[in-house]
């Protein structure tokens, strides 16, 4: 049983997902995301972790024929973000995403962070300047790049590029951030920096992270969900999942007997 005093920020309700091929990748998942907490998704490759994550900002809309069944409700406005009348662009302003590999745009450091603000329609240069600085500080990158904001983003190291992508996601003031294996392409030092940053971001954001690294899930998350073959097998406090899981399937995966 999950123990928390945090309100629910968003939740999936009986969520299923079908790829255009007809494959049912998610099977009736109901799961909360608690406000200003980190939830980790674990499970073997192909279990549906990333598919589930990408439902939250409607990334699947980019490919014709994909189909959602069920709801994802955001609070406090009780908006089902999967409704046809809800603009996916607006959803992605509220729910930002950081991908597995750093994917900076072929632009300057400054323009990478300013991009989302411009898409949103912000034209005031002072406002954009302030938000770029705020986002870079929020991603713990400002001190490293403040004197070369107009350098190409590709000149940054891999770890710096990933923090730049986090800054880009932060610039539009999202309520939720999605991380899809954000450290899998990084070295141990850069990984530690991203994990520390995620812990700091938890003070103002709700975070959902997919990771194949169970030690990482144990280190950074408050809650952990174990998925298998498109189903949610177990969801609980992270300490409970890793020390005393309720389901044998979870225990077998955690202890390396499976997966």
Swiss-Prot record:
Its EC number is 7.3.2.1. It is an enzyme of class 7 (translocase). ATP binds at residues 43-50. It is found in: Cell inner membrane. GO terms for biological process: phosphate ion transmembrane transport. One of its GO terms (cellular component) is plasma membrane. Keywords: ATP-binding, Cell inner membrane, Cell membrane, Membrane, Nucleotide-binding, Phosphate transport, Translocase, Transport. It is a peripheral membrane protein. This is Phosphate import ATP-binding protein PstB. It comes from Methylobacillus flagellatus (strain ATCC 51484 / DSM 6875 / VKM B-1610 / KT). The gene is pstB.
